[in-house]
Amino acid sequence: MNFNLRGAVLANIAGNTQDQLQETIVDAIQSGEEKMLPGLGVLFEVIWKNADENERHDMLETLEQGLKNK
């Protein structure tokens, strides 16, 4: 059986408002459940693909700093 996780995540959130998307992200992070990580990865992929070079640079700086503070 082939299961398209990326497609399922995108179908599940298609048409969501910014508030709904934020709630999804916050809930996934606060739950701390490993099973939520692939969905967050799909959301990050959408952000990354739609970001320009400056936004990508800013995200990478934020990520680098966040990892240094762990």
From Swiss-Prot:
Primary site of residence: other
GO BP annotations, alphabetical order: asexual sporulation; sporulation resulting in formation of a cellular spore
Q: What induces it?
A: Expressed only in the forespore compartment of sporulating cells.
Q: Where in the cell is it found?
A: Spore core
The source's domain of life comes to Bacteria
- InterPro entries per UniProt: SspI (IPR017525)
Q: Which UniProt keywords apply?
A: Sporulation
Q: Which family does it belong to?
A: Belongs to the SspI family.
What is the protein's name according to its record? Answer: Small, acid-soluble spore protein I
What species does this protein belong to?
Answer: Bacillus cytotoxicus (strain DSM 22905 / CIP 110041 / 391-98 / NVH 391-98)
